[in-house]
Each structure stands twice: as structure tokens, then as C-alpha cells.
């Protein structure tokens, strides 16, 4: 009984005497003395071992801000949670902490968890693989990808494509995905994500397929838009004339409904041309950034960023400081910082 009371008192201290659990939006941590840090470490370690799921999750959040020179035992306990905790939610939280702290020493644990049958654990492990840049995971990720049904939209497929796209191109993966891209019976959103995959890793193996999709008016607008976006990212200079011709067709439309429907394709086409060095068309992209509609301006910030053109920095700096929309300001600031 006295041990239970002691632990209850410890938790009480955790909430009251020591600033162990911080507010998520707190910008600065309270400066603690060496003695306080050691006490806080002791309490956090106890919570990670014996606390409720909620308390342990909060303790992991605290670990993300804990001084690394004092966190050895806490990191070790994190590894134990990662490898063998019976509570799958705690393993998910542990994976997130490993990602946040970029603890590459747990690479093998993450690779094993990629094969975990619990969907949330597997999904979080995929995100961790991307954040930690674990290229070694490529064969495992590809095996998981091959087993998926591409006729159905799936967050798992999207996550796999996003992660694999960050690694250098591999012939087997590119060939497999190019085949799925060309199968028009597959889910259009998944095909669009495959198009983005090729732009992300700049694999020109897909260049001609992306161009054909872009030109095909029967293909979904999102797929065509993402295809031309990827052509821009891979600097497909040979595609510029076709993109300019398609853009001219859009400009010559008379139907208001058609003009509205093709706006995403238009702005992606403009962005692609700017990415490939067409300075003359950059002013059209600026026009979107000056639109009265904050939603249009917000999209324009992303497209300005996607161009990779340093000349857009001036308008981004203006938007970050003076745009009427806080969302646009925030997006512009993030674009500058990244």
C-alpha cells in the first residue's frame, strides 16, 4: 500500500511541483537546475514504466524536449517500448518519438515493425522510414506495395509511394509503378500519386507516359495536373512545347464551366514551365498570389515554392509579412524556411 501511495505522490509531483508535462504549444521550456533535471528524469522513467497509456504518451512527448545529455535511460526505455510493449498504441507513440528525435540507432526495430500486422504500427513505421531516410527499407516497402490493390484508393499506398519517392530510383520499382500508372482501370487518385512519385524521385523513365497522360483530355484533371507537375520537377525540357500548346488551348476556352474545371491543370502547367526556366510566364503565377480569394493565394504559395525558382523569394517574403490571411502568411513563412 505504501508503494502505491508513493507512486501516486510521484505522479502528483509530476503535475504540480515539476513542470514535467508541458503544454503542446509552449515555445520555451522552463529552465531547470541539474538537480531538478535528474528528478524529472527519474519521474519520467517511472511513468514510462508504470503509468497509464495516456501518462506514458505524455511522457514520450516530454522526452522529445528533454536534454540529450540526460536522456540515456529514457531513450533505453523508449527502445523497450518500441520492441516489446504489449500496448500497440504505445508502440505507435514510440515510433513517433523515434522519428521526431531521429534516433537512427533503432533502424532495425523500425524495419521489423514495417511488417507488423497492426495497421497503425505499420503505417507509422512507414512514416518513420521516410523521416529517418532509411533507404535500407526499400525492399520491404516494395514488397508491401506489390501486395496492394491499386484499383482502390488507399492511405497505405499513398504513404508507401511518398516514402519510396524520397529514395533514389530503382529499375524494378519504376517498371512496376509505370505499369500501374498506365492501367486506366486503377483508382485515378492512386494513379495521380504514382505520377507524383516519378516527379519526386525525378525518374525520367516515366517522362513519355506522363506527357501522354497530360495531353489526354479523357484522363482525370487531377491526374493530368500531377503528371505535368512531375514533368516540371524532372526538368523535362523536351515537354515544354507540348505544355505551352495545352496551356494555350485552356486560355482559348469560352465556356465558364470548362475554364473553372481546368484551372488546376492551368496553374500546374504554368508552374511546370517556370520550373523549367520559362521566366516570361512567371507573372501569371504571381497573379494567383495576388488574387482576392485567400484560398487561391494559399494554393499559389505552394506552386511558387514548387517552381524552385529563387526569384519568387521576394513575393514570398511579402506574403509572409503582409498578406491579410494568417494561413497564407504561415504558408509563405514555411516556404521560406524550407
Regions found by a protein language model. Name each.
Residues 87-169:
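A generic tandem-repeat structural signature
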Residues 34-47, 68-82, 103-115, 134-148, ...:
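Amphipathic alpha-helical scaffolding segments comprising HEAT/armadillo-like alpha-solenoid repeats
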Residues 18-77, 89:
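N-terminal leader/linker segments that initiate helical-solenoid repeat arrays
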Residues 64, 99, 130, 162-165, ...:
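Structural signature of alpha-helical solenoid repeat scaffolds
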Residues 1-23:
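Classical Sec-dependent N-terminal signal peptides that target proteins to the secretory pathway
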Residues 51-52, 86-87, 117-118, 149-153, ...:
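Short inter-helical turns and helix N-cap capping residues of alpha-solenoid HEAT/ARM repeat scaffolds
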Residues 59, 94, 125, 157-160, ...:
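Conserved hydrophobic register position within alpha-solenoid helical repeats
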Residues 56, 91, 122, 153-157, ...:
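Residue-level detector of extended alpha-helical repeat arrays and alpha-solenoid scaffolds
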Amino acid at each position: 500500500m505504501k508503494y502505491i501511495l508513493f507512486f501516486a505522490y510521484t505522479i502528483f509531483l509530476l503535475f504540480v511541483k515539476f513542470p514535467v508535462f508541458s503544454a503542446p504549444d509552449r515555445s520555451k521550456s522552463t529552465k531547470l537546475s541539474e538537480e531538478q533535471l535528474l528528478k524529472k528524469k527519474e519521474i519520467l522513467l517511472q511513468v514510462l514504466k508504470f503509468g497509464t497509456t495516456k501518462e506514458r504518451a505524455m511522457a514520450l512527448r516530454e522526452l522529445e524536449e528533454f536534454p540529450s545529455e540526460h536522456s540515456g535511460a529514457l531513450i533505453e526505455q523508449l527502445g523497450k517500448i518500441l520492441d516489446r510493449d504489449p500496448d500497440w498504441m504505445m508502440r505507435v507513440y514510440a515510433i513517433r518519438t523515434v522519428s521526431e528525435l531521429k534516433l537512427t540507432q533503432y533502424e532495425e526495430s523500425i524495419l521489423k515493425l514495417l511488417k507488423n500486422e497492426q495497421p497503425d504500427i505499420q503505417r507509422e513505421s512507414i512514416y518513420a522510414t521516410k523521416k529517418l531516410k532509411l533507404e535500407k527499407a526499400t525492399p520491404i516497402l516494395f514488397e508491401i506495395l506489390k501486395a496492394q490493390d491499386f484499383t482502390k484508393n488507399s492511405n497505405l499506398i499513398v504513404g508507401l509511394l511518398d516514402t519510396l519517392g524520397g529514395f533514389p530510383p530503382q529499375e524494378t520499382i519504376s517498371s512496376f509503378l509505370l505499369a500501374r500508372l498506365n492501367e486506366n482501370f486503377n483508382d485515378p487518385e492512386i494513379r495521380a500519386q504514382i505520377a507524383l512519385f516519378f516527379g519526386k524521385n525525378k525518374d525520367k523513365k516515366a517522362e513519355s507516359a506522363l506527357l501522354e497522360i497530360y495531353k489526354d483530355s479523357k484522363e482525370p484533371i487531377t491526374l493530368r495536373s500531377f503528371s505535368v507537375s512531375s514533368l516540371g520537377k524532372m526538368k523535362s525540357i523536351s515537354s515544354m512545347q507540348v505544355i505551352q500548346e495545352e496551356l494555350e488551348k485552356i486560355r482559348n476556352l469560352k465556356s465558364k464551366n470548362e475554364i473553372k474545371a481546368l484551372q488546376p491543370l492551368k496553374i500546374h502547367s504554368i508552374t511546370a514551365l517556370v520550373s523549367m526556366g520559362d521566366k516570361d510566364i512567371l507573372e501569371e503565377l504571381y497573379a494567383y498570389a495576388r488574387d482576392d480569394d485567400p484560398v487561391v493565394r494559399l494554393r499559389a504559395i505552394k506552386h511558387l515554392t514548387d517552381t524552385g525558382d529563387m526569384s519568387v523569394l521576394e513575393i514570398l517574403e511579402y506574403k509572409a509579412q503582409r498578406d491579410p490571411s494568417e494561413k497564407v502568411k504561415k504558408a509563405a513563412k514555411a516556404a521560406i524556411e524550407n
